[in-house]
Swiss-Prot record:
The keyword Lipoprotein does not apply. Belongs to the Nudix hydrolase family. RppH subfamily. The gene is rppH. Its EC number is 3.6.1.-. A motif (Nudix box) lies at residues 43-64. This is RNA pyrophosphohydrolase. One of its GO terms (molecular function) is pyrophosphatase activity. Pfam families: NUDIX. Its cofactor is a divalent metal cation. Residues 6-148 form the Nudix hydrolase domain.
């Protein structure tokens, strides 16, 4: 008998600064509910919601703006399992299956992480190399895979 995993549909954004393509700096934020965990904006896709609508909604909820333009989309859905310390909190899900987008902040867009339900308490725009140095959690392999793909395609 096969044990099927129950993955939560999710969308994630790699947000480039508005100075892209002249400068390639990527937004990364520190979670307010976990110690020293930096990540990209992401969130669940509501039932009946399109992936792109979820992308814009999650950006507005997490970073205070949806003023972005989509540059590229990762061609596959990527999944990961929740670590044991958070799996109970996320019940009935075993992990998430994510669709990644590469987006650029529009000129004049303002980041505001002090949202109605803040998920982050700090953020930075950093280089690709710095991203790899800052990520030290269970999503690191996915981050590396997605960023390498966008690098190989010439986007970053």
């Amino acid at each position: 008998m096969e044990n099927e995993k129950n993955y939560r549909p999710n969308v994630a954004a790699i947000v480039l600064s508005s100075s892209y393509p002249f400068e390639c700096k990527i937004f990364i934020a520190k979670r307010s509910d976990m110690d020293n965990i930096w990540q990209f904006p992401q969130g669940g896709i509501d039932k009946g919601e399109s992936v792109k609508n979820a992308l814009f909604r999650e950006l507005k909820e997490e970073i205070g703006t949806d003023e972005v333009e989509i540059i590229a989309e990762y061609p596959e859905w990527l999944s990961y399992d929740f670590p044991s310390k958070i799996v109970k909190k996320m019940y009935p899900y075993d992990g998430q299956i994510q669709k990644y987008f590469l987006v650029r902040l529009k000129h004049g867009a303002t980041i505001n992480i002090n949202t109605k339900h803040p998920e982050f308490d700090d953020y930075q725009f950093v280089s690709v190399k710095q991203i790899f140095e800052m990520i030290n959690h269970f999503k690191k392999n996915i981050y590396v895979k997605v960023i390498k793909y966008f690098e190989e395609k010439g986007y970053i």
